[in-house]
Design a protein with these regions (language model features):
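Aromatic "clamp/platform" in nucleotide-sugar-dependent glycosyltransferases that forms part
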Residues: 221
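Carbohydrate-associated surface elements
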Residues: 131, 150
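Membrane-proximal helix-turn-helix segments that form the acceptor-binding/catalytic region
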Residues: 56, 107-125
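A short, well-ordered alpha-helix in the C-terminal region of glycosyltransferases
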Residues: 267, 274, 281-296, 302-308
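Short hydrophobic beta-strand element within catalytic cores of glycosyltransferases
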Residues: 238-241
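Active-site proximal beta-strand in glycosyltransferases
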Residues: 67-69, 82-100, 126
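Conserved donor-binding/catalytic core segment of Leloir-type glycosyltransferases
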Residues: 162-179, 185-188
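Conserved acidic donor-binding segment of nucleotide-sugar-dependent glycosyltransferases
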Residues: 253-254, 258-265, 274-279
Length: 316
């Protein structure tokens, strides 16, 4: 089966997920190509330039595919012009809500109208979050297939053993409004530990810091299913996160993590301090997180579902 994956980049977020899926599918005999498109490296021009240049590249290409799979809404503008028997669009969050968090309500309203149309271009829609699945169904009446994004646990064998830094609290993610990094910074003076911010590190370096930390904090205002939570689970690092988006699909409060309201620095600081001081609770949560990810989110568990998804797609 010949598949084209389309994403603005393949180094993180949904694009990183696309690269990981491609790698695993290739290992099982699929012919998967990643489409690389130049774009203007300016914040508000990245997605529009990607959509324009990518669409031109697709129109000029004579190559055909069994499946064209777009990752996130801007990639669908490119997918539309790819010569393929079937098309798929995957999202890791409600795109118009993400735009509203970063820009304005007016911009989001315009995007929302376009979004409802774009979703109709794909033969199949997928998401890794039941929360996102539910929102799109209620908002536009469209059906998404739910597919968890797996964690490639084999790659953690490259992460060396590190000394645990007691009291170290880590944030791993983009330095952007929706990630809530400013909320953690507001809480920082009340935290009885050292906060380390990893906003632009290579994956291995970020994982070394995560592995050495006592707590991972995910203070997001808006989220789908953060990959870093799964990574912390596997490394047995307890997680404190906001109860937004798909995060409660990973974390059961008090069992394999701690959930706090978004935009509440005081509650966030209190939760962090509790985990730092209660070693038994911290250990219990870390062990439960590890059990959850190993039982539910590895490629060994989920790859058969991905293979079946693509095979069934060509049967319809």
């Amino acid at each position: 089966m010949k598949i084209l994956f389309i994403a603005p980049r393949y180094g993180g977020g949904i694009g990183g997920h696309a690269a990981r899926v491609a790698e695993k599918l290739r290992q099982h005999g699929f012919d998967v190509k990643l489409m690389h498109v130049p774009h203007i490296p300016i914040k508000k021009l990245k997605n529009p330039s990607f959509a324009i240049f990518g669409s031109l590249k697709a129109m000029l290409s004579g190559e055909t595919f069994d499946v064209a799979h777009a990752f996130n809404v801007p990639s669908a503008f490119v997918m539309k012009y790819v010569k393929a028997e079937r098309t798929v669009l995957s999202v890791h969050g409600v795109y118009s809500d993400q735009i509203e968090a970063l820009h304005s309500g007016t911009t989001a309203a315009v995007v929302s109208k376009a979004e409802s149309k774009v979703l109709g271009w794909a033969d199949k829609l997928t998401t890794d979050s039941k929360s996102v699945q539910k929102t799109y169904k209620e908002r536009y009446g469209v059906d998404f297939e739910f597919l968890f994004a797996p964690l490639d646990v084999e790659k953690f064998s490259d992460i060396p053993d590190v000394q645990k830094n007691e009291g170290q609290v880590v944030f791993i993610g983009r330095d952007s409004y929706e990630k809530g990094i400013d909320i953690l910074k507001s809480a920082e003076p009340k935290i009885n530990g050292k906060v380390v911010y990893c906003t632009d590190l290579p994956w291995k370096d970020a994982m070394k810091i995560l592995k050495s930390s006592s707590v991972l904090v995910v203070p997001s205002r808006i989220e789908s299913i953060p990959q870093v939570i799964k990574e912390a689970f596997f490394l047995r690092v307890p997680v404190i996160a906001t109860n937004v988006g798909g995060i409660p699909e990973l974390i059961t409060d008090g069992t394999n993590g701690i959930l706090v309201p978004p935009q509440d620095p005081e509650r966030l600081a209190n939760a962090i301090n509790k985990l730092l001081s209660d070693k038994d609770l911290s250990r219990k949560i870390a062990d439960s997180g590890y059990d959850f990810v190993v039982k539910n989110l590895t490629w060994e568990t989920l790859l058969p579902k991905y293979i079946k998804f693509y095979e069934d797609l060509l049967k319809t």
